[in-house]
Amino acid sequence: MARTGKTGGRTPRRALWWRTLIAITACGAAVGGLAAYRGYSDDSTTAERPVTTEEASRLALSRLNLYQASPVAVTLTATEGGGVVVRVEGVVDYRTHRAVGSYRVTGSSGASGPDAGQLDHGLIVWDTGGLGLAPVPEGDDKQPWQQAEHIPRSGWSSRSYTTDPLDAGLQLLIGLGADRPDNPMLLAQSGARWLAHDRIDGRGYDRFAGPRAQGATPGAGSDGGRSPLTYWVDGDGGLRRVTMRMPGLGTPTTVEFTGHEGRAKLPEAPWGGTG
């Protein structure tokens, strides 16, 4: 959003993509973040282990499946500290690397009534370069992508990404889809691990820790050298959830994918001229 040109550019060495995601989280994340989103596990007594060849293949395929499902409905929840939580509900198109949705900030506001706990809300758009915020048009109850089309480029407050949990989550989210699978052998060699088998909304998913950060020593540090990124992948390589542990925060940033959103058409206005 911080730029108006093409946002797609492919990284020459795709094998480094997973390590780039880890860098976004600033590594060295707080202890206990993963435990906050363990959920229901079918294998509570089974120890974690390195991924098998089949599991690495599914994990490697998950990014392509996400790309092919575009546009996809997403929900991002980020804890900013001090009891403040930001929730973004939107749609991501991995073919254009653009996304649009609504955001809501909650916390202790001191207010009463229907708006108790709500600190802010509005529309949000983001791409690989940054994000933009705008107020919801008065009296417009359409979907966020429809509302955003009627707000000119000049109506958006745009900025580049920072290192706060929301921005890190948006950056992670916009980069998850890809037009080809990753290298499963590289994922396995880089320390991806099977953690458990969980159920989400009645469906089974394998929970994986992503590859280790570059230079991390297995078993070292409070997190055992494990990646701050955790993925929930089904038997067909479909990605359902990703969590990202952040430094100093006990609750990880969470991204939920709920499938193809066939009704959505991402607007051109936020990325258009200055009208």
Report residues per predicted region.
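N-terminal leader/targeting segments and the immediate start of mature chains
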Residues: A2-V91, R95-H97, A264, P270-G275
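Structured extracytoplasmic
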Residues: A35-G39, T45-V51, G129, Q143, ...
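Beta-turn initiation residues at beta-strand->coil junctions
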Residues: L76-T79, S102-T106, A134-P137, T243-G248
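Solvent-exposed loop/turn segments connecting transmembrane beta-strands
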Residues: E80-V85, S109-S112, G248-T251
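Short, surface-exposed charged micro-motifs
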Residues: E89-V91, H121-I124, P228-W232
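An acidic-aromatic
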Residues: T96-G175
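Solvent-exposed helix/loop surface patches that form functional interfaces
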Residues: E149-R203, W271
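Gly/Pro-enriched, hydrophobic low-complexity segments
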Residues: H197-G273
